Amino acid sequence: MDFTTFHNIIGGKPRGSDNSHSGVDPLTRTTLWPVPTASPQDVDDAVEAAQRALPAWSQASYDERTGLLEKFADLYLSRAGDFCQLLASECGRTVENAAIEVYWAAQWLRYPSSYKLPEEQIEDDTKTAIVTYEPLGVVAAICPWNSIGKIAPALATGNCVILKPSPFTPYTSLKLVELAQEVFPPSVIQVLSGGNGLGPALVKHPGIQKISFTGSTATGKQILKDGADTMKRITLETAGNNPAIILPDIDVTATVPHISGGLWFNAGQVCIAPRRLYIHADIFDVFVDALVETTKEATKEMTKIGPVQNELQFRKLVKTLDDAKSAGHDMATGGPLADAETGGFFLRPTIIKDASPESSIVSGEHFGPIVTCVRFSDADEAVHLANAGESGLAASIWTTNLTAAKALASRLDVGSVYINGPPQPDPRVPFGGHKQSGLGVEYGLQGLLSFCQTKAVYLYK
């Protein structure tokens, strides 16, 4: 398979287009390979092909489908080196960092094999009711780079999938689906790359039963509106302005490196990365000083932290930092721009000290290497600050007192809480956001069932 030419995959076959677009390597700002731009006819053709493939695929047994996912995981890992290089090019990561995601993705392909779709029976003197879970039909997955987390459960439960990657990061998804044609029947999994009109075309299409989306809250709300006319089933994973609560009993020297790694990995472009640090007043100054020193050391190798993925987001973050500087915020480290000589879309990791909890730099989600530090005096205040705002994706708590940590976790209005460890989803555990950070869950058994519809059959005696 050639990793320098790219096609949409429709009906099991590569398809070009009269129009094309290209991504940009954020490490060097160089233009990458051309990618065909899907047309409205391509959308219709992909949906029709998926509908033709659906009867046979949905009737295959769960074990048959997950067996093919296992086979695909093996095939994918056999090309891991190529995918690491490709992911590094389109996301600006080091190959070592890209490898983390590539091997993570293989585990996501395998996780449905550890489950069975349940069949429930409810019986009384007059009847037996049998509850089963069936495929929804054709699913469109719209996401930037975590597509396997959507593909695996959708295929395992008997749906056909049309993947729509971000126009900024289309390459890995296109090659992933091209490789999948060696394993799955034609049209079971397809991929379309395109511009701003492609997502709405999929959401509004009457032949698609479900949308699974990862991205901004604003786009998620628009998907809900666009999908209303056809009563789409919709799962959303949207913005996360995630809090971390740091209690005074921690060992600062031992804890700061663990927190720092979660802050700056992939330049903070991780949906569950901490963005608001709530630090107990008793250790605030010593903690921030240690975090600043650790961060300064990390910025000596900016390529390991990585660039912002695209110029649009880069410019937004630059403006955010310019505004923060103009507002007089105390930037303990970092600042508006890294040295121009880096060439890529690099920003220095920025720690903003003693920010007002009500300020936009704290309340807004900044998808990049920006972290705010706020003091708190007791648990009630920490919970109040952490729960402020409309996001509720994830939170983390750092303490030696697990009883206190569990009590705090129960009061946080978020979908996932990580105690004394880095925010990192597990494919066996349901993942979803509270408030405006999402709708529904993915992963685990609940995630599998989110790609199903329920049927009850009554047998009268």
Swiss-Prot record:
Keyword Transport appears in the UniProt entry: no
Binding site for NAD(+): 215-220
GO molecular function list: oxidoreductase activity, acting on the aldehyde or oxo group of donors, NAD or NADP as acceptor
Documented EC number(s): 1.2.1.3
One Pfam family linked to the record: Aldedh
Disruption phenotype: Abolishes the production of lucilactaene and NG-391, and leads to the accumulation of prelucilactaene G and prelucilactaene H.
Reactions catalysed: an aldehyde + NAD(+) + H2O = a carboxylate + NADH + 2 H(+)
UniProt keyword list: NAD, Oxidoreductase
Disulfides per UniProt: none
Pathway in which the depicted protein is active: Mycotoxin biosynthesis
Disulfide bond is among the record's keywords: no
Family the UniProt entry places it in: Belongs to the aldehyde dehydrogenase family.
Functional summary from the UniProt entry: Aldehyde dehydrogenase; part of the gene cluster that mediates the biosynthesis of the mycotoxin lucilactaene and the lucilactaene-related compound NG-391 that act as cell cycle inhibitors with potent growth inhibitory activity against malarial parasites, moderate growth inhibitory activity against cancer cells, and no activity against bacteria and fungi.
The protein, known as: Aldehyde dehydrogenase LUC3
Natural source organism: Fusarium sp
Gene designation per UniProt: LUC3
